[in-house]
């Protein structure tokens, strides 16, 4: 069972151990996700040059591959980084942004799944369904499917690739192909701010880097995200002030907030 105590344990561990998260991510969210990692107590590296990927694997605690603004050189860097991480047994978290919206995105995400074998895949309902082989109805990089509509696809994807799959939504779903966990919290403001999904991905990576196992890290990373989002929404007036409030809350997140703002249940 994962409790609020488990969530808090990993929140505190991230602050204490400051895991280095190597993130090859998209132009839209680089600043946002780097600041979120810093606020949570982790240490971001946003390197993407192919020539330094092997060296980055030597110092990182986890790797994030985010396909939001793909180009061929970035695909090369992602594959080099992913293979180096696999060789060193570093956890890799894949964010298949917009999978299903274009063949480049879908084939790249599937190639990473096949060759790198990420520990975690985090996406919205449409992205997960697209990778699972169903019609995901992807609307750009946004989802036309709820997390619950993607449960069967998430389980199938997890079993196929031996990964933990996280489906973000009003209620987040986390599965290793067998167990299914629901994370309840957050705020309707979160989808109104770009980069919140990508932020969830890097927080999951930070938690996986310190957790007892991958499933625990995925659940607690999403729970920390939801708790911070819920409290930040009450302290803000709209999407603009929410972004600032979210970083502040993430930085000062405490056990009381975790206990009061998020619920983690096994389905």
Swiss-Prot record:
Protein name, entry field: Hydroxyethylthiazole kinase
Assigned EC number: 2.7.1.50
Entry's Gene Ontology molecular function annotations: ATP binding; hydroxyethylthiazole kinase activity; magnesium ion binding
Matching InterPro entries: Hyethyz_kinase, Ribokinase-like
Reaction(s) catalysed (UniProt annotation): 5-(2-hydroxyethyl)-4-methylthiazole + ATP = 4-methyl-5-(2-phosphooxyethyl)-thiazole + ADP + H(+)
Residues where ATP binds: 122, 168
Taxonomic lineage: Bacteria, Pseudomonadati, Thermodesulfobacteriota, Desulfovibrionia, Desulfovibrionales
Family assignment from sequence similarity: Belongs to the Thz kinase family.
Cofactor needs: Mg(2+)
One Pfam assignment: HK
Pathway(s) served: Cofactor biosynthesis; thiamine diphosphate biosynthesis; 4-methyl-5-(2-phosphoethyl)-thiazole from 5-(2-hydroxyethyl)-4-methylthiazole: step 1/1
UniProt: substrate binding residues: 46, 195
